[in-house]
Amino acid sequence: MPRTRSDRGQRRAEIIQAATEVIAERGYRGATLSAVAERVGLTQQGLMHHFPTKEALLVAVLDARDQWDMASAALRGQAWPLDIVAELVEYNATRPGIVQAFTVLVGDSVTDGHPAQPHFRERYARVRAGGADALRAAYGDHLPGGLTPERAATLLIAAMDGLQIQWLLDPDSVDMPAAFRDFLALLAPPPAPGTP
């Protein structure tokens, strides 16, 4: 009996989950297609039927991570309020393998012709828009320093990505969640005159 589309979708979901686990255990470089294939009971060739390259599989893992992150925010009733963004940074501190895979892939994707480049262009456009919405909900059309939410969203993402890199390089010295909350505090309006 031929496999149905839902069977293939289920198998792809199993592969993505296995890849997420392998990345968490071994890191980006240690996560091989053969290790993922073994985890789901496939040959490497069988896995490559679903994901032809390691990059394609890792992009699918990152897509699944993004979907989960957005669904978690939606369950709380709003799309990306700033406190949930801070919680996401805190959660990322518990999954270094996924953060490492993201960082390596996004770095590689800046080269011409990289297969993940369209994915990351679209992702960053979507995340900038979501960040701008979160900032607009918190501050209105201008932040205390005068920036528009759109301009500030670019800085918000730069802070998140930059903190991830610093944390990956020196996790004992960089408290990523605390540093991100410090960044958000910089966006807060200045205290009213006469307030301590």
PLM feature segments, named:
Residues 11-14, 18-60:
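Helix-turn-helix
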Residues 51, 104-112:
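Short helix-capping/turn signature of helix-turn-helix
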Residues 113-122, 139-187, 191-196:
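Hydrophobic/aromatic-rich alpha-helical bundle segments in the mid-to-C-terminal region
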Residues 60, 71-99, 145, 149-156:
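Hydrophobic alpha-helical connector segments
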Residues 63-69:
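Short, basic, alpha-helical segments at the C-terminal edge of helix-turn-helix-like DNA-binding modules
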Residues 1-9, 191-196:
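Actinobacteria-biased recognition of intrinsically disordered, low-complexity terminal regions
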Residues 73-78, 96, 114-140:
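Amphipathic alpha-helical packing segments from all-alpha helical-bundle domains
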